[in-house]
Curated annotation (Swiss-Prot):
PTM statement from Swiss-Prot or TrEMBL: Five disulfide bonds are present.
Family statement: Belongs to the cereal trypsin/alpha-amylase inhibitor family.
Lineage of the organism: Eukaryota, Viridiplantae, Streptophyta, Embryophyta, Tracheophyta
Cellular location(s): Secreted
Disulfide pairings: 41-89, 55-77, 63-121, 78-137, 91-149
Superkingdom of origin organism: Eukaryota
Name assigned to this protein: Alpha-amylase/trypsin inhibitor RA16
Coiled coil ranges: none
């Protein structure tokens, strides 16, 4: 008889725990938590249309002469990257920034990693510099590995 009471008590504890967890999950989802970027990570919505001007300057200088970047430019870049409200949108903003750099220099949006974007700077080098900015600036990105954005050339991911 005592063992039946223990079993019933244990089952009751499990049921109450499950109900509490379910209520917590329901409350959490009513707050409309966004888990993926979807339509929000677009120029002018999730980040500025002309994003990260300090990061553009930083990446260009890093590409041409690694290690020679002004501390003020580096801090400005990190501030601009951290200011993007949704951490999900940071890699998209960096990818959009790269496309702007390519257009400004007359390079195609997609191309061979060894192709020169501008004098002394290859596409692969500038892409690696941009992709590693979240880790360098110590800002959160939920869609990268070790703080490094990953994307396939020309796709934005």
């Amino acid at each position: 008889m005592a063992s039946n009471k223990v079993v019933i008590s244990a089952l009751l504890v499990v049921v109450v725990s499950v109900l509490a967890a379910t209520t917590t999950m329901a409350d959490h989802h009513q707050e409309q938590v966004v888990y993926t970027p979807g339509q929000l990570c677009q120029p002018g919505i999730g980040y500025p249309t002309y994003p990260l001007p300090r990061c553009r300057a930083f990446v260009k200088r890093q590409c041409v002469a690694p290690g020679t970047v002004d501390e003020q430019v580096r801090r400005g870049c990190c501030r601009q990257l951290a200011a993007i409200d949704s951490s999900w949108c940071r890699c998209d903003a960096l990818n959009h920034m790269l496309r702007i750099i390519y257009r400004e220099s007359g390079a195609a949006d997609a191309g061979h990693p060894m192709a020169e974007v501008f004098r002394g700077c290859r596409r692969g080098d500038i892409e690696r510099a941009a992709a590693s900015l979240p880790a360098f600036c110590n800002v959160d990105i939920p869609n990268g590995v070790g703080g490094v954005c990953y994307w396939l050339p020309g796709t934005g991911y």
